[in-house]
Amino acid sequence: MCIRDSSYIEAATNKGYNVLLMDGQLDIAVVSMLEQKFEKVRFTRVDSDIIDNLIVKEDKKNEALEAGKQEVLSSIFKSQLPKMDKTEFNITAQALGENATPIMITQSEYMRRMKEMANIQAGMSFYGEMPDMFNLVLNSDHKLVKEVLADEDKECAAAVAPVQAEMDEVNKQRTDLKKKQEGKKDEDIPTAEKDKVNELDKKWDELKTQKEGIFADYAAKNKVVRQLIDLALLQNGMLKGEALNNFVKRSIDLIK
């Protein structure tokens, strides 16, 4: 059992769930067979999702962070994620409780099964070639994540405001034009209008990149952001080499 396993297992057992240790080469095939035999039984790894989503419930809580803050957190943390070969991260923020971990990494049960089956079953090599997809989940209830949001607002608001205002205006013009074109055939839309929409799309993309650059510059100076990312990577055995050495140095600096 590794650090990654033990922390997720502890969270599941604390929730009252029964956890099976299945780390053999044939276990994925056994699990699939059992799920086919017992239609109402489903197996899922303890690190495939946040603890509240492991077992599907009808009374699921819905405390999503507002879209604007979701975007800010995503831009900040995405800018500081290390580049890894054939590895991609999707960043989300969810209310997990103030006592839960501030950040965690999960990986879809479905994709992991497909990639594992690709290693032992002919005809599924397509899944084996796909990049590993991970979810970086930020706990919006945690003090550290709240502090990052508050500090970002203080440091970036003045620079972001004019860019966002221009983005809103560009988006309004784009929406108005597309609404005007609704119901028309492509050949009936004047070339000038098509060019204008393309121009607005390009302008919006440029402004979005500019705004993300502001968040990236802020994130690069915030040691807590990178520390949280590295803690999540370390927990999942994904922090190695120079990145691990930098994490150790930063940890020492933070506790001096």
Across the structure, where does each feature detected by a protein language model lie?
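Long, intrinsically disordered, charge-dense linkers/tails
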Residues: 1-256
